C-alpha cells in the first residue's frame, strides 16, 4: 500500500530523519536501558536540504478537529508571509537552508486518508521517525517538510492526549508513545536541558516525554476517534453537554482556558 507512491518518485526526499535528529539530540535508543542500540542511524540515502527549523507548540483549540475542512489552499497562500517569518526562526549556526524552497513545490492541498497512509509508509521506507523524540521543534520540521515538498497544509498534526497520542487525522500511522528517561540520561550534563528527552516535557501539556512509533493498524482502526470521540465535537454524535463533560473530566477545557488567558 505504501510502496506504490515511493516507486513513482523520480528523486529521493529531503533528509527528513537526519534533520529531525539534528534538532538537538538523537533518538531514545541511546539514552534508555534495554533499548536496541543503533536505531538512530538513517536507513536510506535521503536527499539533503531540510533544515532544523525552530518550532512553535501546537495550541489546543476546542472545535479544531480532523483535517479542518474550512481551510482551503487560497486562504493558506495569504498566510505565506507569516510562514516565511517562522521559517526564518532558526539557529544562527544552521547552514542547511541552501536549496530549501520558501514556497511549496506543488499546489497546496489538505491531508487526506490516502495521502496520510502513503506519506507514513514513504517516510518509514526512507528511515522513518521510529524512536525519535517528539518536540515542538521537530513537530514544526515535519510540518514544513510536508508542506514544501508535498504541498500539504500544516493543519493535520493534532494529537489526542495524555498517554499514547493518536493523530486525529485518520490514516497517519505514526503514534507518539510516552517513554521513561533513565536516571543516567537525566543526570547526563551533555544532554540535560538541550536534548529533546528533556525539552519535550516542556512542550507537552502533560509533561510527558514522547517518541514516535510506527503502527500499521492505524490504517484501519481510528483509535483517536474510538478512544476520545469528545475531541471531535459535534462530529462525534455526542451532545454538546456530554462533549464538555468529557473534555472537562480530562482537563482539556481548563487547559484551553489557561492558554487563552496566558
UniProtKB/Swiss-Prot annotation:
N-myristoyl glycine-type lipidated residues: 2
Mediates dimerization: annotated span: 140-156
Cellular compartments annotated: Host cell membrane
InterPro entries, sorted: HIV-1_Nef_core_sf, HIV_Nef
Molecular function per GO: GTP binding
Region (Acidic) location: 88-96
Disulfide topology: none
Comment block on domains: The N-terminal domain is composed of the N-myristoyl glycine and of a cluster of positively charged amino acids. It is required for inner plasma membrane targeting of Nef.
Note: This is a macaque isolate.
Subunit structure: Homodimer. Interacts with host CD247/TCRZ; this interaction induces down-regulation of cell surface TCR/CD3 complexes.
Known role: Seems to play a role in optimizing the host cell environment for viral replication without causing cell death by apoptosis. Enhances virus infectivity and pathogenicity. Probably involved in viral immune evasion mechanisms. In infected CD4(+) T-lymphocytes, down-regulates cell surface expression of CD4, CD28, CD3, and MHC-I or MHC-II molecules.
Protein name: Protein Nef
Organism: Simian immunodeficiency virus (isolate Mm142-83) (SIV-mac)
Record gene name: nef
Amino acid at each position: 500500500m505504501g510502496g506504490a507512491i515511493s516507486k513513482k518518485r523520480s528523486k529521493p526526499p529531503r533528509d527528513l530523519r537526519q534533520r529531525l535528529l539534528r534538532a538537538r539530540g538523537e533518538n531514545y535508543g541511546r539514552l534508555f536501558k534495554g533499548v536496541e542500540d543503533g536505531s538512530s542511524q538513517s536507513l536510506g540515502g535521503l536527499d539533503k536540504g531540510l533544515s532544523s527549523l525552530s518550532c512553535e507548540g501546537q495550541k489546543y483549540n476546542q472545535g479544531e478537529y480532523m483535517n479542518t475542512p474550512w481551510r482551503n489552499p487560497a486562504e493558506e497562500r495569504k498566510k505565506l508571509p507569516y510562514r516565511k517569518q517562522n521559517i526564518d526562526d532558526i539557529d544562527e549556526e544552521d547552514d542547511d537552508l541552501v536549496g530549501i524552497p520558501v514556497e511549496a513545490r506543488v499546489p497546496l492541498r489538505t491531508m487526506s486518508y490516502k495521502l496520510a497512509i502513503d506519506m507514513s509508509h514513504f517516510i518509514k521506507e526512507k528511515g522513518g521517525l521510529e524512536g525519535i523524540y517528539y518536540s515542538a521543534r521537530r513537530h514544526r520540521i515535519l510540518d514544513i517538510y510536508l508542506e514544501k515538498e508535498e504541498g500539504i497544509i500544516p493543519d493535520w498534526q493534532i494529537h489526542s492526549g495524555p498517554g499514547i497520542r493518536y493523530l486525529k487525522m485518520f490514516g497517519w500511522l505514526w503514534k507518539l508513545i510516552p517513554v521513561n528517561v533513565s536516571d543516567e540520561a537525566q543526570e547526563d550534563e551533555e544532554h540535560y536541558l538541550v536534548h529533546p528527552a528533556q525539552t519535550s516535557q516542556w512542550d507537552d501539556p502533560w509533561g510527558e516525554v514522547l517518541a514516535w512509533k510506527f503502527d500499521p493498524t492505524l490504517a484501519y482502526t481510528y483509535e483517536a476517534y474510538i478512544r476520545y470521540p469528545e475531541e471531535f465535537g459535534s462530529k462525534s454524535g455526542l451532545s454538546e453537554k456530554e462533549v464538555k463533560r468529557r473534555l472537562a473530566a480530562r482537563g482539556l477545557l481548563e487547559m484551553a482556558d489557561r492558554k487563552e488567558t496566558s
